[in-house]
Amino acid sequence: MRTLVVFYSQGGETRWTAEQVARRLSAEMLELDPAKAYPQKGFAKFFHGGRDATFGAAPALKPYAFDGAAYDRIVFGTPVWAGSYAPPLRTFIEENRAALSGKRFAAFACQMGSGAERAFARLKKTLNAESLDGTLALISPLKKPDHANAERLDAFCAALERV
């Protein structure tokens, strides 16, 4: 199945995970980059990201190339912000809704604590998808690597290979 990993990463955790997923699935990657970067540190990082996630913002993105006809499945990768997915994914989905029609979807999320299941539910709703082929929630996989995260990543990719 021709797969594209579409992701937004602020601190590198989601980028690292996207690279692992893409390598295991022989998939291409598309990193979304907001036209105006989110703050990287301190209170502003959590305030701006959390506000935009909570209120469904769709920030402008820097130009990217996407040919929906080239892929059967899209795997979305996101940090968890205020129990939701990162707003750049919303922009991508809204800009490409027609090209995403009829595709299969999966998702992974990197989080510092909890909220991934809620983020997956919101992503599924935004996609108007009945289901996701698989989901994966990891807690700080780059900063706090552990055996459990590695096992979950392996299982997620193996399950997607069977679909």
Give short role names for the model-derived ranges.
Residues 131-163:
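Glycine-rich phosphate/pyrophosphate-binding loop and the adjoining helix
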Residues 109-114:
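Short beta-alpha junction loops
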Residues 25, 126-131:
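Short, structured coil segments at secondary-structure junctions
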Residues 118-128:
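Short, aromatic/basic amphipathic alpha-helical patches
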